[in-house]
Amino acid sequence: TVNLAVVEALAERLTELGFEVDVLTATVPVRYTADALISVHADANPDTTRRGYKSAHTRPARNALEPLLKLAIDRRVFLATDQPDDDRNVSGNMLQYYAFNHQRFRHAAAPRTPGLLVELGYLSNDADMTLMRDPDLYADAIARGLVDYLQEIGRL
């Protein structure tokens, strides 16, 4: 699948860079802690002309780092893919994603762990799907964004 291919390539990149990487299943460990938790998804829509990349952290942000993580990763993905920004279509479910919603769900990241849900593009759009057939494109962009973020907050 698209998501798994990107996640595996991303984990490989980050491991090569010396990071400790946890590839998690849909069930997040209770109060999971990390420098960042990135949940990778692909979207679809009956309107096959809808396309673009979007991402979201909880709103309001659970911590001051989430907006910085979003900006760093978004910047790199947009540079790498030249996709349109689809943030206007961020859903309420994305904003209250269970893996980041420690108040409602036991199996969620700790509040201090910055989280970001990324929607790589639309499986229902040919242009986005063409890009998503190259998992390395997204893995490299997300890895670079994560490095930028960690440098910005002084963790690298």
Task: Give the label of every model feature segment.
Residues V2-L156:
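Active-site-proximal helix/loop segments of hydrolytic enzymes
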